[in-house]
Structure formats: structure tokens, C-alpha cells
Amino acid sequence: MLAESELGTKLCFKHSLRPKNSDNYQSQFTHHLEAYEAFPDLTGYAVSKPLFLDKEQQISIFEFANGQNLRDYLSYDCPSQKSQLVVLETAGRWLDHYHRARTTEFHTFNPRWAVNHYCQIRNRIETGKLGVPAPGLFLKGVSKIEEEAANLKGLETVACIQHGDFHMGNLIWDGKVVTGIDISTGHLAPVGHDVNKFLVDYVRRFRPASALSTGQVLPPDVREAFFSGYTLVSPEDPTVRLFSHAQLLELWMKIPKRKKDRTRAKQLCLQQIKPIAKKAFTKSG
């Protein structure tokens, strides 16, 4: 909800009715506040300013970020592929500033946790304990993660403080300033999580599967554009490579198995990711 203060400042009111978890609501507000305080003072890049929290009522107030979220901007006002790539570079630069603003740690990548996680999911699907749409294709994705992980173990990666929900709806663009909103976590994790949540969100909405190379989730020009702005790691970072496939599976698991149980948005998401999966989950070589 939009309002205006006595001083003329535009305000954004947020009220969360469900789930009722005041401690979690406060925690998310605190993470956003910490991100705002740490973010560098830069021309053209910002984090929305938190102003007020009522923990028990689950109400918060932020300074309003002018503009459109990138999902809407690219859908309605930036339809050409060339202009979208410029926006992707800008988004990459915002995330680069965000990740560098606080703790960064270099690590040797061990994909064992990710592989074990998805192997457990595969076991639940095969034993009937978990239902997903198009399970055969989903399981090819698990096999692809196993294949990729074997080639990525031992490579260097970077962990940093995550955004937590870095999709296209959480960057606001007014033509001059790109502003991050809805920051929800404060823990260290590999950079590939934030990077792929954003890029897979873009690819599924705006790129046909024909643009992909076999075995890949992200088209080459998308990688080049984003990583022209995001320079903390290269597109060859092991978590960027592995978690692109994992992000497809994470989206997939949120979609009900039965079509009649899906919202229109969930059905659309499935229609978007299946063609990508058919190309991306093909074995390399």
C-alpha cells in the first residue's frame, strides 16, 4: 500500500496476515535494515529504506521505491532482447555491490550436500512419498546435478550474505536508479543461489528453450550480460553452474502434481520450465 508522509515522502506499508510468526517477521525486517545500512552510497543503485516495524501486528513501513519491478518493466516497456541485456548487466552490477558490501569468504566447493539433498528427493519420488509433475523429466535433472557435481568438486567459489529472494520482482527500476527490496535473510551462502534465482526467473519468462546450449540453463548472451555487471565471480563459478539446474528443480517442487490443484501462475511456471529442462537436462557430450 502506498501513502505519503507529512513531509511529502512516499511510503510503502506492508502487512503480513499469514503466516503468523512475529519473530520471523522481525527477523526479515532486521535483515533488510542491516542490508540497507551496509549498502554503499552509489549513484544509480540502492536498497529501499526501512522506517518502522510493529512486530506483533506484522506491519512495516519502507520508503517507497519509485519505478517498476524488472519483471513488469521487461514485459511491457523493454521488449527487445538487446535492451533486456543492458538491464541484466545493471541487475548484475546491483547484486555485485550487494554481495561485496558485507562479509565474503572464499571456499573450496564441495557439492556433496547438494547431491545428497537431491538424491533424497529422488528416493522420495521413486517410493511415492513425493509427487511432482512430469517426474521422469524431473529425475533427469537430479542425474544432471550428479553429473555436473563430479566435474565441479574442489573448485574455488565465494560465499556472501544472501538476498534471500532475489527474483526479478524484487528489483525496482525507474530509468535512473535500481533499488533492491524484500531482503529476507542474513546468512552466508554460495553466490550461485542469488545469481541463479534471478537468472532462471528471467530465462523462463523471456527466452525460448531454443536459445539454450545443450546441457545448459542460461543462454550465452544472458551469462555474458549479467556477468559484465557482476564481477565477484565469473560465470564459470562452480555454484553458478550447478545451481542453475538446482533452481529449476526448486521451482518444480513448488508446483502441485495434479493440474487441477495448480494456480494459473503455477501452471504457467511449469509450461515455462519444462522446455528448458528438456534441453538443460540432456547429458553433455
Over which residues does each language-model region extend?
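Short beta-strand micro-motifs within the conserved protein kinase catalytic domain, predominantly
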Residues: V47-Q58
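Active-site activation/catalytic loop segments of kinase-like enzymes and analogous catalytic loops
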Residues: H193-S234, H245-R264
